[in-house]
């Protein structure tokens, strides 16, 4: 048996969520493997879905909201002619209709679902009502009135469509429900539709090229491997930097002299071409991430969101 006290893990992991697990179940497994004191995930994926599930450890959780607000990219395969209770293949079929649309009608339907779109979250979603996820009400047969959400669909690419299935690539804003999008498409085509496969490919500029599979982590935890390798070094090497969620912000360096004052929450003078904006602040000598600062028009750097000392 492998035992270890909980650690102060700091970093960011791009996990490839497996099918059939909730996002929270995946998080708890990863947290146990890393023996991490603090961890969270960004952007809930349905049990049926796979793909990018960002995991933030320790100090990285302070910046998760920036990545959560980013655009998302999905690949989805849907079955046409059938509407289900959950808008995906996990539910029961509630209605069947013939598939009679033409290529032109499909093109028009996809165009109508592009741009600013109003969606009503599915009852089988993680949206909370009075602190309880909607899917828990749905399982008890309780229907809750949901507020309309306005989302933005930047692009829908038709990958393929044959017989009773269709494959799409979707680029959308935060908060978009792909199941709802597919169900709405089915209604516009007068045949119904539900998701049978969903994979998240990208969040912001972070793509699946750096994904780590849960099965890979579990294999490393195998008792024989734990004995043979420096286990924690191996898994910690998979982590991306703490500032990954704010990678899009400009990067600046401050001297160690100014750093001592800055860490105490005091503003420091800083000459820069950047004005009135957030920046990533690094210590000049060793390239250590300090946190976020805000530069104003008076060439002053003000502490905005700082990290604690990054030690394990």
UniProtKB/Swiss-Prot annotation:
CDD domains: PseudoU_synth_EcTruB, PUA_TruB_bacterial. Keywords: Isomerase, tRNA processing. GO terms for biological process: mRNA pseudouridine synthesis; tRNA pseudouridine synthesis. Substrate binds at residues 74, 177, 198. Its EC number is 5.4.99.25. Coiled coil: none annotated. It is an enzyme of class 5 (isomerase). It catalyses: uridine(55) in tRNA = pseudouridine(55) in tRNA. GO terms for molecular function: RNA binding; tRNA pseudouridine(55) synthase activity. Belongs to the pseudouridine synthase TruB family. Type 1 subfamily. Responsible for synthesis of pseudouridine from uracil-55 in the psi GC loop of transfer RNAs. This is tRNA pseudouridine synthase B. The gene is truB.
